[in-house]
Structures are given as C-alpha cells and as structure tokens.
Amino acid sequence: MSTKDPHRLPHEKGFHISWDQIHRDSRALAWRLDGQGPDEGAWRAVVAITRGGMAPAMIVSRELDIRTVDTISVKSYHHQAQGQAQVLKAPDAGLMGDGTGILVIDDLVDSGKTLELVREMYPNAHFATVYAKPKGRPMVDTFITEVSQDTWIFFPWDMALQYVEPYRGTD
C-alpha cells in the first residue's frame, strides 16, 4: 500500500537549473537571436515577462547590447497550480505598438497560455524562451531546450541551498 506524500509536488519529474546553467542557456538564446531582428537584424527593445523572464531578459539584452528593456507582468500560476492568465502590468504602449522589433522573453513556455495572451496584445513581437514544453511550443518563436510536459523545472530563484540528510540516514 502506498501513501501519498502531501509535501511532494504533483509532478513526476524535476529538472533543477543552476544559476550557471540559466546564464549559459540565456547566452545561447541571445546568440540564436543575434542578427534576427527586423531592422537590419537589430531589435528595438526587450520585454521580460515577470518574474521568470527577468533574468534571461537581462542576459539577452546585455549580450545583444539592447538598452531599452521593459516588463509585462502576467499572473498565471499560484505556487504550482496554473490558473487563468491575466495582465497585471503592461509595458509602455508607445514602445510596443504591434510588437514589431520587440523581443518578448520568458524563462519557460509551459501550456502556452501566458504567451498566447501576450501574443494577442503584440502579434508582431518575437517570442523567445529558454525552455519549452510541447503544449506551449507553438506559442514561442525561439527557444533553447525542450523538456517533457510532465517535467517540473526548478529555477535557481525559487531554490535555497540547505542541508539534506544522507540517503541511508545518520548514526
């Protein structure tokens, strides 16, 4: 008879991302986006989807020397439960227009609901994520790594280092 651990996440797989790995993968995303903008290869601005997209957006904007950076705040998760996506804060309307020349960056596309909402607002923006799951993949234009739908990604900003008991216990 198995008992369910109430403290265990409902996801079957966990993928732990370190700060070093998100930095490397975000730089790889920048390299993939370099020269792909509509203005002789250049991008006008970067818009980070908060909060997860902020670290990758900072790295991409640095690597591509893009000085204009804004945010869009979309809430679609409460802890690990996904809900209805809603915009809490939109970027500057004058900057955005229809999204032409704008890189919208997030850490992950999961179901695609967040990107779908933002894409409706800015249909000509280029959507880039570091990681992508199969359900959300059609919503993203560029990504670095695909993971299975049942994988839960643990980002470094959500983690803390702590002592863990040895597997076999202690004396």
Curated annotation (Swiss-Prot):
Q: Which parts of the sequence bind 5-phospho-alpha-D-ribose 1-diphosphate?
A: 51-52, 106-114
- Specify which residues bind GMP according to the UniProt entry for this protein: 110-114, 152-153
Q: What catalytic activity is recorded?
A: GMP + diphosphate = guanine + 5-phospho-alpha-D-ribose 1-diphosphate; XMP + diphosphate = xanthine + 5-phospho-alpha-D-ribose 1-diphosphate; IMP + diphosphate = hypoxanthine + 5-phospho-alpha-D-ribose 1-diphosphate
Q: What cofactors does the UniProt entry give for this protein?
A: Mg(2+)
Any one cellular-component term (Gene Ontology): plasma membrane
Record flagged with keyword Calcium: no
Annotated guanine binding sites: 110, 153
Q: Name one GO molecular function term.
A: hypoxanthine phosphoribosyltransferase activity
Q: Which PANTHER family match?
A: XANTHINE PHOSPHORIBOSYLTRANSFERASE (PTHR39563), XANTHINE-GUANINE PHOSPHORIBOSYLTRANSFERASE (PTHR39563:SF1)
Name this protein carries in UniProt:
Xanthine-guanine phosphoribosyltransferase
Question: Which organism is the protein's source?
Answer: Ruegeria pomeroyi (strain ATCC 700808 / DSM 15171 / DSS-3) (Silicibacter pomeroyi)
